[in-house]
Curated annotation (Swiss-Prot):
Keyword Metal-binding: no
Organism expressing this protein natively: Orientia tsutsugamushi (strain Boryong) (Rickettsia tsutsugamushi)
Enzyme class name: hydrolase
Active-site residues (renumbered): 137 (proton donor/acceptor)
Top-rank taxon: Bacteria
Annotated binding of dCTP, by residue: 111-116, 135-137, 156, 170, 179-180
UniProt name for this protein: dCTP deaminase
CDD domains (alphabetical): trimeric_dUTPase
Subunit structure: Homotrimer.
Catalytic reaction annotation: dCTP + H2O + H(+) = dUTP + NH4(+)
Name of encoding gene: dcd
Pfam family, one: DCD
């Protein structure tokens, strides 16, 4: 299994629509202002977070149960900035839509700028033939409110190509988050 380079990522994005919209270079500034970078990098792709967020709140006391998720524990916010309360959590989604090839898996890692501020980003792997916008999980590990910037880089996807296509892909097993659009809540 090999990590794939910028040349391969660009070719797959342009010929197979693996990432859409696709930015073929690192964007680090907008309107002469520094931003959290996004776009193609040497061995990965820095994805942007959209302006749709779901923020956990404790206004309705409940227990978070992944088997019976109660969305009343979330506040939906459409904004260029998301403020995550101290020691809390928010969901976002990528601007980019991904279509994974059958012989490729992608791993997501967080941006160091966010990590150095105590904001941790988690995404499970993009399995072979996974398709859709990717729901991002932001955890504010600090005792202070934390800010997330919509339209800017949030995480980096690294692409690994297997020595042959897998026998059973995410699509073959009817993965529950196939073709998700926007923030997708947990389901079992």
């Amino acid at each position: 299994m090999s990590i794939m380079s910028d040349n391969w990522i660009k070719k797959m994005a342009e010929s197979k629509n693996m990432i859409s919209p696709f930015v073929d270079k690192q964007v680090r500034a907008r309107n002469n202002q520094q931003i959290l970078s996004y776009g193609l990098s040497s061995y990965g792709y820095d994805a942007r977070v959209s302006n749709e967020f779901k923020i956990f709140t404790n206004t309705k006391p409940s227990i978070i149960d992944p088997k019976k998720f109660d969305q009343d524990c979330l506040i939906t916010k459409i904004s260029d900035i998301c403020i995550i309360p101290p020691n809390s959590f928010a969901l976002g989604t990528t601007i980019e839509y991904f279509k994974m090839p059958r012989d490729v898996i992608a791993i997501c890692i967080g941006k160091s700028t966010y990590a150095r501020c105590g904001i941790i980003i988690n995404v499970t792997p993009l399995e072979p033939e996974c398709e859709g916008h990717i729901t991002l999980e932001f955890s504010n590990t600090t005792p202070l409110p934390a800010k997330i910037y919509a339209g800017e880089g949030a995480c980096q996807f690294l692409f690994f190509k297997g020595d042959q296509p897998c026998n059973t892909s995410y699509l073959d097993r009817y993965g529950r988050y196939t073709k998700q659009i926007g923030v997708t809540l947990p389901t079992v």
